């Protein structure tokens, strides 16, 4: 609805009907996508899974903070490996501290097992006829697995409602803002408008382009691409090579900050996803 000012703020059925009629005649309303009942259910399930992932992350932070407070330091290279977990279980703090650590580790185990079970269920949901083909296409991109692909599909719905890839990137808030006055133009950070959840997923996926050789395809990526048409695989390979090359150019040649480069890659990844979902892959 257009903003109303002055006397036009008076609301009656007759005035409202007149305004709605004018807006419809002049095409001032933007079309919206009404998600199906199935999409809504899957979306809620995926967000529930992400809530558990966030809870697991917080428990990990609490365990590490507990060890730091009591001067327990792990000599290994990485946390949350099998060696690190065995080390945590072998600790013998005094008195009540042992019980505290055991409760933390129990919560960690419960959440880890639940996430594993939920991820298996997500694989089953993605295998449904209504999602299988679309999920398979999106999984051809580096950093995009079943959970991310299915989340983007049910969160966005109909990709064809966006006239261009730029419109889709704008919808999820990955385009830069602008503050213009007269002849002066000032570029701002990304708008962060629209669907925050999709933006977060694509930003996380873009981190995978910060490592690995340009043009290299891992065994896991080849397995995900298996079963798709040669045209789909070629389009995804072109996107993967371009995005990885652009990331290295921004960071190494232009000395851009890593987060700035990752956000730029996330925006282009969104554009390539739009092309994949609307069959603009020529």
Put a short name on every predicted segment.
Residues 1-282:
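A detector of single, family-specific signature residues
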């Amino acid at each position: 609805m257009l903003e109303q000012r002055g006397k036009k703020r008076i609301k009656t059925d007759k005035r409202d009907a007149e305004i709605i009629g004018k807006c419809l005649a002049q095409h001032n309303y933007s079309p919206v996508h009404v998600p199906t009942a199935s999409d809504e259910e899957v979306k809620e399930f995926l967000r529930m899974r992400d809530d558990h992932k966030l809870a697991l992350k917080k428990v990990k932070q609490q365990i590490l903070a507990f060890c730091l407070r009591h001067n327990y330091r792990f000599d290994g290279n990485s946390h949350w490996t099998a060696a690190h977990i065995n080390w945590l279980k072998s600790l013998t703090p005094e008195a009540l501290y042992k019980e505290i650590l055991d409760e933390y580790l129990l919560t960690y185990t419960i959440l880890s097992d639940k996430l594993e079970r939920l991820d298996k269920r997500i694989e089953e949901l993605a295998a449904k006829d209504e999602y299988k083909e679309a999920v398979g296409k999106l999984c051809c991109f580096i950093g995009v697995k079943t959970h991310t692909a299915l989340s983007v599909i049910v969160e966005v719905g109909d990709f064809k409602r966006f006239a261009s890839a730029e419109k889709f990137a704008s919808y999820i808030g990955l385009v830069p803002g602008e503050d213009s006055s007269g002849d002066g133009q000032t570029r701002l950070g990304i708008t962060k408008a629209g669907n925050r959840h999709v933006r977060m997923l694509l930003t996380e996926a873009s981190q995978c382009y910060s490592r690995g050789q340009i043009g290299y395809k891992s065994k896991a990526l080849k397995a995900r691409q298996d079963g798709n048409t040669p045209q789909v695989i070629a389009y995804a390979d072109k996107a993967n090579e371009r995005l990885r090359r652009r990331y290295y150019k921004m960071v190494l040649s232009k000395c851009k900050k890593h987060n700035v480069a990752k956000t730029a890659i996330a925006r282009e990844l969104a554009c390539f996803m739009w092309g994949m979902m609307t069959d603009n892959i020529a």
